[in-house]
C-alpha cells in the first residue's frame, strides 16, 4: 500500500516542473529580443528642436519675423525630417522662449504669430558637450599622453646618436678647415714667388737701358763728315770759273 501511494504522489510533480521550465525558457527570448530592440534604435538624424528653430529664424532673416509655417518649411528642407511630427515640440519651444525673452513675438499670440531672435540670443552659444564626448576626449587625451611618454622614452637613444653625429660633423668641419688653411698657405707661397719675378725682370730692364744710347753717338758722326766734305767740292769748282773768264778776254 505504501508503494502505491508514493507512486501516485510522485506523478503530478513532473508536469508542474516541465511547465515551469517552459515558462522560463519563453521569458528568456522575450527579454533578449527587447534588449536587441533597445540596441537597434537608431539615433536621431537631426539636432534638437531648439537648435533647428533658432537656426531657421536666424537664416530666414525676415524683417517682420518668421512665422510658424516658414519655420516648419525651413526645418523640413534643411534637416530632412517630418516637421508635422515635430510641430508640438516647436510650438512649446516658441512659447517658452517668448516667456524667457529669448524670442520676440512681433505678430499674433501664442505659437501662431511671427517670431524674431532677441539681441542676447543672436550671440551664438557654445554647444554643450555631452558626457559621452567628454569621456571620449579624456580617453583620447590619456592615450595621447601615454603615446608621448613612449615616444619620449624611445627618443632618448636617438639623442645619443645625434650627439655622435654632431661630433662627427664637428671633426669633419675641423678637418675641412685645416685643409682649407693649408691650401690658402700654398696659394700665398705661389703668389709670393710669382710677385718676386717681375722685380727681377724690372731690374734687368733697368740695367739694359743705359746700353741703348751708345749706337746714337755712332750714327751722328757720319753726318758731320758729309757736311765737312761738301765745301771742298765747291772750292774745287771755283777755279773752273776763272778759266772761263780768261778765255773771254
Swiss-Prot record:
Signal peptide: none
Annotated PROSITE patterns: H15 (PS51504)
Main localization, broad class: nucleus
SMART domains cross-referenced by the UniProt entry: H15
CDD domains documented for this protein: H15
Subcellular location: Nucleus; Chromosome
Biased composition (Basic residues): 146-158, 234-249
Chain intervals with Basic and acidic residues compositional bias: 121-134, 173-190
Biased composition (Low complexity): 1-19, 27-43, 195-233
GO BP annotation list: chromosome condensation; negative regulation of DNA recombination; nucleosome assembly
Residue ranges of every copy of the H15 domain listed in the record: 45-119
Annotated region described as Disordered, given as residue ranges: 1-53, 105-249
Keywords attached to this entry: Chromosome, DNA-binding, Nucleus
GO molecular function: double-stranded DNA binding; nucleosomal DNA binding; structural constituent of chromatin
GO cellular component: nucleosome; nucleus
Gene3D superfamilies listed in its UniProt record: Winged helix-like DNA-binding domain superfamily/Winged helix DNA-binding domain
Family affiliation: Belongs to the histone H1/H5 family.
Its job: Histones H1 are necessary for the condensation of nucleosome chains into higher-order structures.
Official protein name in the record: Histone H1
Lineage: Eukaryota, Metazoa, Ecdysozoa, Arthropoda, Hexapoda
Amino acid at each position: 500500500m505504501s508503494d502505491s501511494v508514493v507512486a501516485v504522489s510522485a506523478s503530478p510533480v513532473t508536469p508542474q516542473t516541465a511547465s515551469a521550465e517552459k515558462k522560463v525558457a519563453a521569458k528568456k527570448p522575450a527579454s533578449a529580443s527587447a534588449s536587441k530592440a533597445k540596441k537597434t534604435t537608431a539615433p536621431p538624424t537631426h539636432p534638437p528642436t531648439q537648435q533647428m528653430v533658432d537656426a531657421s529664424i536666424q537664416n530666414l532673416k525676415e524683417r517682420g519675423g518668421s512665422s510658424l509655417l516658414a519655420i516648419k518649411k525651413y526645418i523640413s528642407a534643411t534637416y530632412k525630417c517630418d516637421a508635422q511630427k515635430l510641430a508640438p515640440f516647436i510650438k512649446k519651444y516658441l512659447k517658452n522662449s517668448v516667456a524667457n525673452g529669448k524670442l520676440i513675438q512681433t505678430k499674433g499670440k501664442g505659437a501662431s504669430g511671427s517670431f524674431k531672435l532677441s539681441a542676447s540670443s543672436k550671440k551664438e552659444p557654445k554647444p554643450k558637450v555631452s558626457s559621452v564626448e567628454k569621456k571620449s576626449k579624456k580617453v583620447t587625451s590619456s592615450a595621447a599622453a601615454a603615446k608621448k611618454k613612449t615616444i619620449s622614452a624611445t627618443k632618448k637613444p636617438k639623442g645619443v646618436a645625434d650627439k655622435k653625429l654632431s661630433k662627427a660633423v664637428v671633426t669633419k668641419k675641423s678637418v675641412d678647415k685645416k685643409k682649407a688653411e693649408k691650401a690658402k698657405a700654398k696659394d700665398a707661397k705661389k703668389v709670393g714667388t710669382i710677385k718676386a719675378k717681375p722685380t727681377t725682370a724690372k731690374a734687368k730692364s733697368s740695367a739694359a737701358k743705359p746700353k741703348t744710347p751708345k749706337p746714337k753717338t755712332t750714327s751722328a758722326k757720319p753726318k758731320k763728315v758729309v757736311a765737312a766734305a761738301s765745301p771742298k767740292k765747291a772750292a774745287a769748282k771755283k777755279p773752273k770759273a776763272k778759266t772761263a773768264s780768261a778765255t773771254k778776254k
